[in-house]
């Protein structure tokens, strides 16, 4: 969810050296920070407006080059899709109807399928499967283009499950799910997962019943759907969801939790959920809104101790230059070590999207520089690759075992300099004189995604020139661990 972004002076770069002299970085070939599962985006809210657009599906979910507004855009190649189970409905239940926050935009109201409490049977008239068509359409377009990891997530229970019938939150930001509806929330999500598998040709690999549940800003006058849920209630919902998924033959779908807003809150929540709940979780999801701060290593340690997978399942900010994105993303690779990474809104205004858009007006503008920064990572570090220790706080590395290819992404924050990359730890560091393909993006403005082939191997090293505030990606073939 959107939160106040850090200023440019708080980009979390304190650990990166600002030096003009040439710097040598040694890639650690013996390291293994996990097998990469992919890059993704959440479909709410942008797909509600643009879910019928094939050109946008091509841009986000393929690596082909797409002509978009007379500009050739390199497709981002996202393969993770987070589909939102809506909480809103315009259908009253008896004398009750949904209370709408005075501050919420229509584009942020996601229509839910369980429109009244009369029946839990998904084939009954209490369920409406003909709403939210555009979000579903984009999910299916993504699937047709090769996206292979789908997660169902909830921002709030259905409005009629909340204490005040307002899916934006409680008046004071307290818990807003009725105690007798915690199990019903699990039924809701399990029914969607089952229906999607049987009718939409979509198998949700994971289901997340919570979203930033410990936050106290989910209030009745909020700008989006959200719900504070106490720790004990979170644990209860997780247990109920496991049972409901199993009852529908969805034992293969695992539960992720708890999508807390910050790394620090994630640590607190995970330490408080209890063994029963944690034993029902297959992956830790955490959001990246602590930006350059927070206990990334603490979240990782819990994941390691519990044998759980780990994703940064939501990240976003309003810095269209790409500076915050590359800084925080590299810190995630360095200290959080997730195996999946999801950008919140690829289409949005005010710098939040990687392509400018107004989801309410239905207008789409141009790709910003952040788009091309994300492309440096998402187009080259692909699912199935082994993440390596890049050897420095400004370097990320990944190894493609099937194709014997090494990928390095690096940023130079200081004065222009050459970075020398040492591959001597590999059993085969390509060959002397081999071409190293390079792509470069200038943060802020300038070069967007420029490919060149002038860099070559010299023995087991290669050197590349970096301007200040430049991101570069290198692909080195014929490398063996």
Language-model features, listed with the residues they occupy:
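Fungal secretory targeting signals
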Residues: 1-22, 481
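N-terminal catalytic cores of secreted or lumenal carbohydrate-active enzymes
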Residues: 22, 28-204
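Active-site neighborhood of glycoside hydrolase catalytic domains
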Residues: 184-203, 213-318
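Carbohydrate-binding surface patches
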Residues: 390-430, 469
